[in-house]
A protein has these predicted regions:
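Beta-strand-enriched cores of mature, soluble protein domains
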Residues: 2-149
Length: 149
């Protein structure tokens, strides 16, 4: 039996994360979508800049999130994200679970997959990455990405 929160289990979880491969910051805008099954739904557009695989990049994405019966959020970016660099572009798809924050923002944790032919971003092809996506109540976003070992 594994007890969540034990020091030994925490060390095991940390070892599952590989190298940090991306850090982005930027802004978001939200749009309310028609409710699904009586629960709120949202669409978010994000524009960020940062580094991915050591390369300066710009990113744009649109994702949707639906509130679940327990108040949590499930979000998807179904191949509607793009990362641009000086030698090409990458597209990405992502899914994640999240929750609203006290200041009116949201935080998500999930998986992201990149596809590219840009030479500078080839290191992200064919890998499952995990991420933290945090947005404050003013729409300021931070996206951190790690390889999943």
């Amino acid at each position: 039996m594994i007890r969540v929160g034990t020091k030994k289990n925490l060390l095991k979880r940390r070892n599952m994360l590989g190298e940090k491969v991306g850090t982005f910051t930027g802004t978001t805008t939200d749009k309310v979508l028609p409710a699904q099954g009586g629960f709120p739904a949202f669409e978010t557009s994000a524009q960020t800049t940062g580094k991915l695989a050591g390369v300066d990049v710009q990113s744009m994405a649109t994702y949707s999130a639906q509130m679940q019966p327990d108040g949590s959020l499930y979000g998807e970016c179904p191949n509607s994200g793009v990362v641009m660099t000086s030698d090409g572009a990458a597209t990405f798809r992502a899914t994640g679970c999240g929750q609203m924050t006290a200041d009116g923002g949201a935080k998500f944790r999930g998986a992201v997959y990149f596809q590219t032919s840009a030479p500078s971003l080839m290191a992200v092809n064919g890998k499952c990455m995990v991420y933290e996506w945090d947005v404050d109540g003013q729409g300021n976003a931070t996206w951190n990405i790690w390889e999943w070992a």
